[in-house]
Each structure stands twice: as C-alpha cells, then as structure tokens.
Amino acid sequence: MEEYTDSGEDKNVYSDDDNDYFTASTQNNRTSKNTDSSPLDPKRLAEEMSKIQPKHEKEKKKLFESYYKTRENEENGADNHCFKFNKIYTDLKFDYSVLVSGFGSKIQLIETFVKEFCTDGPSLHFKGYLPNLSVRDLLYKITFSLFGIDKKIASPIAHCNFIKSIFESGSMDINKMRQTFGGRFDYGIPDHVYVVIHNIDGYSLRNETSQLTLALLATIPQVHMIATIDAIGAQLLWDNRMLSNFNWTTYSMPTYQPYDLELSYDTNTKGGGGGGGIGSKSSSGTNKNLQPSTILTVLKSLTEISTDIFKELLTYLIKKKKNKMEFKILFDICRDAFLVSSESGLKTQLREFIDHKIIIQKEIGDTTFLIIPIETSVMEIILSQLENSIS
C-alpha cells in the first residue's frame, strides 16, 4: 500500500506505520483563545438591527386575528366559541388562571385581549421581564392603585394576605374600611380585578418567594390572573401546591413578533460584554447604552400621561442644560399642567421609568433629584421624535 505524502514538509502525515499514530497524538494541540468575535458597539448594533426588514407581516397579522373575532371571521360564519380569546375569558370567569406560551412577543396579544374583553373591572399590568422588578413592587401597586393604601408591609406573603383580607371585607362600610386598612377606597372594592404578568418566568420573579406570593394572590376569587411564559421548562418553577393555587389553564398562542420591548433592557443583547446594557454608565455619568430607540420603545407601552410627564422633564433639562431636576419642581410643573394631583401620583407615574433605569432617583441631603443619564443632544432627539409623533 502506498504511503500518502505531499510536497510539503508536514511531519504529521499518516501512513501504515503503527508508530505514526502515537507520534502524531503526542503533538500539542493548541486552540486560539480568540475564537469569539468582539461584541458590537451598542450604537452600531442598534443601527444594524434597524436595517432588518420585517418579514411575513401578512401571515403574522392573520395568525394574530385568528385568536379573536374579526369582521372577516364573522363574515365566514365562525362561532364565538371557536376563538381562543372567548375561551380564555370563559376560563377566567370559572376561576382559572390563564397561562399563555408560544414563540414571539405576546405583549400586544394580551393587551388586546384585556382591552376587548376585560371591561368589567380594573386591570393591572406587570412587566416580569424587567431585571429589577420585585414582587413587593407588584403588591404595592395593587394596594395603592386599587385602594389608595400607601404603606409597606413586612413580607410579600403578609402583604398578599393583607390584600386577601381587604377583598374578604367587601360587605364592610367604606368608612370602616378606611379606618381598618388606612386607604382611601374611592372606588370601593371591585368585583373583578385582572392581574396581567408579562413573563411570569422573568429573571426577577424566578425565586420561590415571588412564585409562592403570586400563587397565593391567584387564590383570591376576585383576582383573575393572566400570565405569559417564554423560558423552556418554565413550569418547573412550580411545585404541586403552587400549581393547585394558580389553577392554570394553558394556551399556546405563538405570534412570531419580535421581542423588542422585552429585550430593551437585556445586557446580553446590547453588546459590550460585562457591564453593557441599559444600566451601563460612562465615566461622565451618562448611560452610554441608553439609546433614543430604547427609550421610545419603552414610551410606546406607557400611558399618555406618563409620556407627557417625561416630556416636561426633558423640556426642563434641555432648557437648563442639565441632566437632573428636583422632584418638587417637576411636581409643581405637572400639577399646573393637570397631569397629577399629588406627589404619590407622580411617583406612581415615574415608577416605569425608574424600573427601566431611564430615570435615576437620588437623594442629596433633604432634596430628591430625578436624573436622566444621557447627553443633552440625546434628550433633544427624543423630545423631537415625541413631538413629531403627536403632530
């Protein structure tokens, strides 16, 4: 048998000689440590991603509309019970909690369902994909938004039991409830409350305390819970007791929509390795990765009042050429513009911006400052786009 050789001087050529195997295997195999490409600069990454054209928009829209009754579906003679939105609403009324899975962002899907179907009570929406959302924040929003109770309770479980006791006292006189629980109770106690949790499997809610608390919250008869999941194996978060309390009925409803909002905070998708993402600051005190597109994406999910408050803040900072403003000054401006009537109301409106680290709240002495960690030029771009979207 002929031995294979080439014109080069490669010493690791294999032949029929048995000893050649051991000769070759003793050579050191070194692998370069520079196998990974360097992450893109966040600004460059945003520019490149903006060039990606959406695909299959007609098919996505048709899929989205297949979940609920549209004029086209009605003309085709489809019955209401054929649509998942109708089934979900029925399940909620039969004391099930609803868990929605499927590839693609489901924010618009769930928001549409709540807007069209859940009209017999208030709805509270929570963004489980926020890295710093805590179950305490969620419970506080429930007690403050529904009952006007502004107080902190020792533990999440105790807070949830406190909420449960409020709902159980529905037959109590309003004045007595105010004395007992300390809230305003301007609208009494609603018969139906819809609690929406986008990404209940989000990083900040994956701990046992959070899931135990949410499961306990789901046992309140007046509370109808709607949640979405995206992580593979998310249901491993719950033991048998939690599953019994949640009482899930599950729906697969893929949308194939991009996860723009969910990933707007994610450091792993912003480039820059460690320290990248929304919360990364430069030595000048500005957040080098907080881009206008990121802020505008967040603003799309907020109310008109929240957007107007943010515009007032931007206008003041641009005029003063600063990146911080006293909370008291912003409150006076917003009160005069009839955007808020109390400081607690302003704090509630600012919560979303603080959660996304678009606004940083800092105490200096006895004064509370609100800081937007971006350059004035970036503020001007954002304000200009906000005003153009209105005009």
From Swiss-Prot:
Q: State whether keyword DNA-binding applies.
A: yes
Q: Which UniProt keywords apply?
A: DNA replication, DNA-binding, Nucleus
Gene Ontology MF term list: DNA replication origin binding
Residue ranges annotated as compositionally biased, kind Polar residues, are 22-38
Q: InterPro entries in the record, alphabetically?
A: ORC2, RecA-like_ORC2, WHD_ORC2
Question: Which superkingdom?
Answer: Eukaryota
Region annotation (Disordered) maps to: 1-43
- One of its Pfam families is WHD_ORC2
One of the GO biological process terms: DNA replication
Gene Ontology cellular component list: cytoplasm; nuclear origin of replication recognition complex; nucleus
Q: Where in the cell is it found?
A: Nucleus
- Assigned protein family: Belongs to the ORC2 family.
Q: How does it assemble?
A: ORC is composed of six subunits.
Function in brief: Component of the origin recognition complex (ORC) that binds origins of replication. DNA-binding is ATP-dependent, however specific DNA sequences that define origins of replication have not been identified so far. ORC is required to assemble the pre-replication complex necessary to initiate DNA replication.
Please state what the protein is called.
Answer: Origin recognition complex subunit 2
Origin species: Dictyostelium discoideum (Social amoeba)
| Gene name of this polypeptide | orcB
